[in-house]
């Protein structure tokens, strides 16, 4: 089932300011926190040097810069998530898509590289890889997308045939071309899955309930006219 949403509802689902889940996503691991702290320390030192150069004439500006740079490590995740949200909100149209899990498979993805020195003093590059779960979601029109997330224990209950609900985003009113998809909700498992928590989840669950909830197979749903049109996903 594909149901178009109003612009107002779309803006509730992907808010301007980062949600708690989005903040946690960009907070990252302890290495990320340390990196941001180092940036804050260096920036504060630069501000103090500017104070010595400019003197008391720029006291108010220096104080403002010191506060901003000193708390960079804290507000940076909010900024990053909000900018990512803003990019998605530039897309004009959205639709609630109730799909079916057509396939589930695992992959290993390269997420970074580190340079280190081995016991012989040689410089070597160590690849950091992460196991990820991939879900192929589709409907009766033949349209499908693949969403991916880091593999976790809670994913072991995911199976083919289960319902998955998410948003399709597009610049075309008929959603015939899909520019972006959000993270997905699997009602049977009460589980969210995706590489980034795009959605305001309480609002999305309310939309899902208004559209009939979901514990049945999508094969039993009555599809609207838009769902019967062929759609194309921009990769």
For each feature predicted by the language model, list its residue ranges:
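A composition-biased, non-transmembrane "mature-region" signal
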Residues: 2-21, 92-114
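Transmembrane alpha-helices and immediately adjacent membrane-cytoplasm interface residues
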Residues: 58-89
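N-terminal membrane-targeting/pre-transmembrane regions
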Residues: 1-46
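Membrane-interfacial hairpin junctions
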Residues: 47-62
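Short nucleic-acid-contacting surface segments enriched for D/E, G, S/T with interspersed K/R
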Residues: 150-167
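OB-fold/S1-family single-stranded nucleic acid-binding modules
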Residues: 169-218, 224-231
């Amino acid at each position: 089932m594909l149901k178009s949403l109003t612009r107002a509802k779309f803006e509730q689902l992907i808010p301007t300011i980062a949600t708690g889940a989005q903040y946690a996503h960009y907070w990252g691991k302890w290495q990320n926190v340390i990196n941001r702290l180092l940036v804050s320390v260096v920036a504060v030192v630069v501000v103090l040097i500017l104070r010595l150069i400019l003197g008391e004439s720029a006291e108010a500006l220096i104080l403002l810069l010191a506060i901003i740079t000193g708390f960079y490590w804290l507000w940076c995740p909010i900024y990053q998530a909000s900018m990512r949200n803003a990019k998605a909100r530039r897309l004009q149209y959205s639709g609630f898509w109730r799909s079916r899990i057509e396939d589930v498979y695992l992959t290993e993805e390269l997420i970074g590289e580190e340079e280190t020195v081995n016991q012989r003093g040689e410089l070597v590059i160590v690849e950091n890889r992460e196991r990820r779960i991939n879900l192929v979601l589709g409907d009766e029109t033949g349209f499908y997308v693949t969403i991916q997330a880091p593999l976790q224990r809670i994913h072991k209950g995911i199976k083919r045939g289960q319902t998955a609900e998410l948003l399709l985003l597009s610049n075309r009113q008929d959603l015939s071309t899909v520019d972006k998809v959000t993270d997905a909700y699997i009602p049977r498992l009460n589980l969210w899955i995706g590489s980034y928590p795009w959605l305001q989840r309480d609002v999305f669950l309310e939309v899902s309930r208004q559209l009939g909830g979901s514990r049945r197979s999508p094969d039993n749903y009555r599809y609207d006219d838009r769902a019967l049109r062929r759609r194309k996903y921009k990769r």
